[in-house]
Amino acid sequence: MMTNATGERNLALIQEVLEVFPETARKERRKHMMVSDPKMKSVGKCIISNRKSQPGVMTVRGCAYAGSKGVVFGPIKDMAHISHGPAGCGQYSRAERRNYYTGVSGVDSFGTLNFTSDFQERDIVFGGDKKLSKLIEEMELLFPLTKGITIQSECPVGLIGDDISAVANASSKALDKPVIPVRCEGFRGVSQSLGHHIANDVVRDWILNNREGQPFETTPYDVAIIGDYNIGGDAWASRILLEEMGLRVVAQWSGDGTLVEMENTPFVKLNLVHCYRSMNYIARHMEEKHQIPWMEYNFFGPTKIAESLRKIADQFDDTIRANAEAVIARYEGQMAAIIAKYRPRLEGRKVLLYMGGLRPRHVIGAYEDLGMEIIAAGYEFAHNDDYDRTLPDLKEGTLLFDDASSYELEAFVKALKPDLIGSGIKEKYIFQKMGVPFRQMHSWDYSGPYHGYDGFAIFARDMDMTLNNPAWNELTAPWLKSA
């Protein structure tokens, strides 16, 4: 039973916010909210996640197609990813996550291009297999340097039952390069999370075995970065630290990743998983089949960076451990100067977080390094093990919520009165118009990187720039207005 005053207040807030719902909906939504308790090792049945959103409720979740094409496969730069279906899905999933990559777009890198079969009514009636085959032929003519192609199926393709696997097999033989079908129709599952899982299974079945039995020169220090999508250059900032401590990064995907890097991943000694939610499936598979250990790491803020570097180093020998300590020491002065500059300007500010993937827990340490307090955290599409991993980083009584509706989120903000909200593009303009400082934490509000020591300097600057912007003097939050 929660005795903490903050916890009691937040329990009462949950009941108050849910009062507007009919009884059935109220009971269902109550299962998706709790207050944190440091004594708990697992959320157990205190919070329920990865369930279908309530009909009629405005949810900010994405779909399975978004999880596969927009997250896992889209950033693989030397492959072309076909959005097989209406043109809109491909356009809205094109380049919105700012997955930085090296290369020449349209020549040897294709991540920002929208390849679509542009389904029309006649394709629904007569099927789109022939159109898809023709599309792949034209792509090979126009973009011959692609190393492979994925077919990301959208809702209509699944509804009419097109056989994209047959088209993929025939095209692969004709082109002598991988053409990979991904059955990620948006209506499948309850959120983009199933799309991650589907894409992981496709990587397992179509890519990871491609170089099995072939020679590959290894070292004792080979690692792979998995699940860093290089938003604003995050993976590059992380890779620097790993290489400075003496590790060899054999593969990095999906951000700035290539097909051959994915194929080489089974040769590494350790898989480093950044986004646990989207990539834990493939990491577990490689652990079972190839006996490759894996670990989640967190490179947000100097405290968590040092903690993660030491945990990574513990997987290797004394040389790497010594190197890790040297890397941490090398950046201590720089980090101390950043904290000395920005912490006095940010100390005590309250933050509400609502994001997907890993960020609601990973960014907590970075905010705390700047003296800021997390008063509420929520996930759009988490599973219960995500909440289990979040509990240790939250103070007692912190509000924790899952798949919040627009109404619930606004009600929490009005009651908790955060100084800053970190969430997504769908929420950004609502809260800015309410007069609440906001950071778009899915793509770093067109800034970044935020990972690594280099990223923390930018993170601290951006939080200060957002909270202490004089423009907020021209706006007043609703709860600060006089009656």
Curated annotation (Swiss-Prot):
The keyword Lipid metabolism does not apply. Pfam families: Oxidored_nitro. GO terms for cellular component: molybdenum-iron nitrogenase complex. Binds 1 [8Fe-7S] cluster per heterodimer. Binds 1 [7Fe-Mo-9S-C-homocitryl] cluster per subunit. Its cofactor is [8Fe-7S] cluster; [7Fe-Mo-9S-C-homocitryl] cluster. GO terms for biological process: nitrogen fixation. Keywords: ATP-binding, Iron, Iron-sulfur, Metal-binding, Molybdenum, Nitrogen fixation, Nucleotide-binding, Oxidoreductase. [7Fe-Mo-9S-C-homocitryl] cluster binds at residues 275, 442. InterPro entries: Nase/OxRdtase_comp1, Nase_comp1_asu, Nase_comp1_CS, Nase_Mo-Fe_asu. Transmembrane segments: none annotated. Its EC number is 1.18.6.1. GO terms for molecular function: ATP binding; iron-sulfur cluster binding; metal ion binding; nitrogenase activity. It catalyses: N2 + 8 reduced [2Fe-2S]-[ferredoxin] + 16 ATP + 16 H2O = H2 + 8 oxidized [2Fe-2S]-[ferredoxin] + 2 NH4(+) + 16 ADP + 16 phosphate + 6 H(+). [8Fe-7S] cluster binds at residues 63, 89, 155. PANTHER family: NITROGENASE MOLYBDENUM-IRON PROTEIN ALPHA CHAIN. Tetramer of two alpha and two beta chains. Forms complex with the iron protein (nitrogenase component 2). This molybdenum-iron protein is part of the nitrogenase complex that catalyzes the key enzymatic reactions in nitrogen fixation. Belongs to the NifD/NifK/NifE/NifN family. This is Nitrogenase molybdenum-iron protein alpha chain. The lineage of its organism: Bacteria, Pseudomonadati, Pseudomonadota, Gammaproteobacteria, Enterobacterales.
